[in-house]
């Protein structure tokens, strides 16, 4: 498996917290700085409702083809966790190792971003989740996307706790943060000051964190 100079995993505390929006913002921000990027979605499951899939959105943001972002055989048109969608559609089960092995990066990519599915402990393959994949790909940084409002402290603590054993620094991004919302402000301060998480509230801050992190990871 080839590897970019810097490799990031974007994951979430739950489904629909805005992982794809954040990842697209990162890709746009990096490209605006002249950084060659590539995005990968190891597997995607989705409703057939006519809306663009995550892979299509990430492809548009990174200047790639959707099936370069997510291989065609990993598109599952059923709105459930990817391994469950595969089973529901009568398709072959797959492992975390197979997802990791299918990650193929263009030689020009200075930054590669992997967006996972669902929450940190949501099934990503028949034998694992985002934590499993992080152990396999050894990212240089993990970006945990969370809601800014009620319930986020518990969700971040549980998700970040599961990710910390992977060795990569975890940056918490509070999505949809409103500086005028007292609860959002208190949640950010609690996570940063009491729990000592690295918390950001804008995509611009995320771009800087990603570019500042040491690259290299584990190379083949």
Located regions from the model:
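N-terminal phosphate/diphosphate-binding loop that engages ATP/GTP or pyrophosphate donors
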Residues: 5, 21-91
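Short, low-complexity, intrinsically disordered N-terminal peptides in bacterial proteins
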Residues: 1-8, 207-220
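Phosphate-binding/switch loop-helix module in NTP-utilizing enzymes
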Residues: 81-124, 131
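Short, high-confidence coil segments that cap the C-terminus of an alpha-helix
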Residues: 5, 35-36, 106-110, 139
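Beta-strand-loop-alpha "switch" segments that mediate conformational coupling across diverse proteins
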Residues: 80, 192-211
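Generic beta-sheet signal
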Residues: 6-10, 110-114, 142, 170
């Amino acid at each position: 498996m080839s590897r970019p100079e810097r490799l990031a995993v974007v994951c979430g505390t739950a489904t629909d917290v805005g992982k794809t929006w954040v990842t697209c913002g990162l890709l746009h921000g990096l490209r605006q700085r002249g950084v060659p990027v590539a995005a990968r979605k190891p597997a995607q499951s989705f409703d057939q409702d006519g809306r663009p899939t995550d892979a299509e959105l990430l492809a548009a943001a990174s200047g790639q083809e959707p099936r370069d972002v997510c291989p065609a055989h990993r598109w599952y048109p059923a709105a459930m966790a990817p391994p469950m969608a595969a089973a529901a559609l009568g398709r072959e089960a797959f492992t975390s190792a197979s997802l990791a092995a299918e990650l193929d990066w263009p030689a020009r990519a200075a930054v590669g971003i992997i967006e996972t599915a669902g929450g940190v402990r949501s099934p990503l393959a028949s034998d694992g989740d985002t934590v499993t994949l992080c152990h396999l790909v050894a990212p240089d940084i993990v970006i945990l996307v969370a809601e800014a409002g009620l319930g986020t402290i518990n969700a971040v603590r549980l998700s970040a706790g599961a990710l910390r054993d992977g060795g990569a620094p975890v940056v918490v991004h509070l999505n949809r943060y409103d500086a005028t919302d007292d609860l959002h402000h208190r949640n950010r301060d609690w996570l940063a000051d009491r729990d000592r998480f690295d918390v950001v509230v804008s995509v611009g801050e995320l771009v800087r964190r990603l570019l500042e992190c040491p690259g290299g990871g584990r190379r083949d």
